[in-house]
Amino acid sequence: MAAKEVKFGDSARKKMLTGVNVLADAVKATLGPKGRNVIIEKSFGAPTITKDGVSVAKEIELEDRFENMGAQLVKDVASRANDDAGDGTTTATVLAQAIVNEGYKAVAAGMNPMDLKRGIDKATIAIVAELKNLSKPCADTKAIAQVGTISANSDSSIGDIIAEAMEKVGKEGVITVEEGTGLENELSVVEGMQFDRGYLSPYFVNKPETMVAELDSPLILLVDKKISNIREMLPVLEAVAKAGRPLLIVSEDVEGEALATLVVNNMRGIVKVAAVKAPGFGDRRKAMLQDIAVLTGGTVISEEIGLSLESATLENLGSAKRVTISKENTIIVDGAGVEQDIQARITQIRAQVAETSSDYDREKLQERLAKLSGGVAVIKVGAGSEVEMKEKKARVEDALHATRAAVEEGVVPGGGVALIRALEALTNLTGDNADQNVGIAVLRRAVEAPLRQIAANSGDEPSVVVNEVKNGKGNYGYNAATGVYGDMIEMGILDPTKVTRSALQAAASIGGLILTTEAAIADKPKAEGAGGGGMPDMGGMGGMGGMM
């Protein structure tokens, strides 16, 4: 085991504080409408230019191991805020830096770190409760566009396109962000449930000009196994032919004799039919088949529940208004499922989203959720160069997270004003002892930090701006983009309550941990030249001279 170096008390905290400040100073340069860019060198290709706090934080690794511990803890603040609300990483970093710096002074002056932390925690709870009181619901398109604009560093085109996407697919719908091919941002919307499986044979195509198979008012057969024997399917095919409606088959696979028979029937016009593979693999495929069943009002034919394909009847089949199948995708529009069943399925998937700890599983569950709740919107980001494209795509994703957070928990006045107004909650708050009161005072000063930084990045005097905002009431604040004081909501400067809350809670949590650290342990740096020596000189290899 490698030897360790241990630092205690003030010398440990001082080193960590240096690391906190290095990381936070790099991140906070990006805060606000006049925040600057940070340029990051890459091991290959062009450098990345970004105004995204978490992207900057992730790149920082310090040489001194004790300083690096402090930096990594603040990086964790940015990541926590990002995981919880998808935005607010820079605000969280600025708050954490302020809490650590203010708290460090108090610890150095002889205050008890544990009582300080309790005071900070008490004040955080009070401010979070006050933020909830200040919060206003965010329901209309205009407010959603404003939130998106602010999060995308005051780019109104991004705010508008996100608001339009939310209007079209609903608050729960899936909105994905992709790299576009032009200079302008584009929005395309797919109605209904789409999954990434195309037709199993091009002979199912009935629209040769677009190479798609389109079925109007089809019946939908869902089978949780491979179909290779046509005899199993004959009863269902005969019933569908009598009903005179098209048929879509979604199964693990259709192959051999079964596929050939379906193609022949389709080409002769006996039964208008198309077959696709079920989406996903393993247990996820079973779950997605069940989703399609709920959406279309059908039953999955599965031997696990005692249903065989031979005994399937028209009652087991789902239906939809229209199905469009291309080479790679299938879209089911307006399924005939019962609304109550669909809502129950959505509630069940939401519970699974809340329980899962895997990011990949969460993403897949949210995709299923959106497919059930109607519609997928794709925002294609346009830009003039690849470097700009990456930077812009990151901003669009941030803005999308912020708008979702705003819809979920409402909005508060932006620009650091909500935190200043929430200070009223601390007016009569007292701790159990003098040191806890100092902890409350630490947070009281720290929550001014985002507004101070926004003002500083705009070239204004932070103390003057903070005093002016404190003397105002309600939504009165400072628009750093124009240098004007006024009603923040009317000026369209809004922050999602969830983003502000998550930023404060993450910052207070990590800030308290750093202040209560009494010992820090790191690997001892290896002495130069301590590695293994080179291989000894092996001399020439004899007997090789005659070889050319």
Swiss-Prot record:
InterPro entries: Chaperonin_Cpn60_CS, Cpn60/GroEL, Cpn60/GroEL/TCP-1, GroEL-like_apical_dom_sf, GROEL-like_equatorial_sf, TCP-1-like_intermed_sf. PROSITE patterns: CHAPERONINS_CPN60. Keywords: ATP-binding, Chaperone, Cytoplasm, Isomerase, Nucleotide-binding, Stress response. ATP binds at residues 30-33, 51, 87-91, 415, 479-481, 495. GO terms for molecular function: ATP binding; ATP-dependent protein folding chaperone; isomerase activity; unfolded protein binding. It holds the Pfam family Cpn60_TCP1. It comes from the Bacteria. Belongs to the chaperonin (HSP60) family. This is Chaperonin GroEL. It comes from Pseudomonas fluorescens (strain SBW25). The lineage of its organism: Bacteria, Pseudomonadati, Pseudomonadota, Gammaproteobacteria, Pseudomonadales.
